[in-house]
Amino acid sequence: MKLQLCAVGRLRSGPERDLVEDYLARFERTGRPLGLPPVQLLELEDRKGGGMEAEADLIAKAVAPGAALVILDERGRTLSSPEFADHLAHWRDSGRDVALAIGGADGLAPRLRDRADLAMSLGRMVWPHMLVRVMLAEQLYRAATILAGSPYHRV
């Protein structure tokens, strides 16, 4: 299993990058004994300014062949943290590669949304795509702690 986080744009040095790196390091430490691979963070830049369609091309090229494509989209399904952990465990157990995709400021092209195996929402509010990385990295770590039976996730 390979786990990719494909995100449009680059995080500059600062608190958001620090948080993403911290949560992904925590995920790696917690997930390794559970058979979860480290997250491969792919920051994709549309240098030609082609908008959502060009960003969709970059994401499609970055996704491992045959990987389950999970997109973050405001129209997607809202999962609880334990439900997300169940999905992560299922992907791990099936051995299927997974690519989590975060679009740019304008979202994801419809053709990429149509291709997705799962469209996930972090709630009904719209979030800046840079903050979505932090939130998703934290949820990956939280999912690993749920699978490990750690007290990090309290209900």
From Swiss-Prot:
Binding site for S-adenosyl-L-methionine: 72, 103, 122-127
Designated gene of the protein: rlmH
Function comment: Specifically methylates the pseudouridine at position 1915 (m3Psi1915) in 23S rRNA.
UniProt entry keywords in alphabetical sequence: Cytoplasm, Methyltransferase, rRNA processing, S-adenosyl-L-methionine, Transferase
Molecular function (Gene Ontology), one example: rRNA (pseudouridine-N3-)-methyltransferase activity
EC number: 2.1.1.177
Cellular localisation: Cytoplasm
Official protein name in the record: Ribosomal RNA large subunit methyltransferase H
Reactions that this protein is recorded to catalyse: pseudouridine(1915) in 23S rRNA + S-adenosyl-L-methionine = N(3)-methylpseudouridine(1915) in 23S rRNA + S-adenosyl-L-homocysteine + H(+)
Enzyme category, top tier: transferase
One Pfam entry name: SPOUT_MTase
Gene3D superfamilies reported in the protein's UniProt record: 3.40.1280.10
Superkingdom field: Bacteria
Family label: Belongs to the RNA methyltransferase RlmH family.
Complex and partners: Homodimer.
Record field: transmembrane: none
InterPro entries from the UniProt entry: Alpha/beta_knot_MTases, RlmH-like, tRNA_m1G_MTases_N
HAMAP family: 23SrRNA_methyltr_H
Principal location: cytoplasm
Gene Ontology CC annotation, any one: cytoplasm
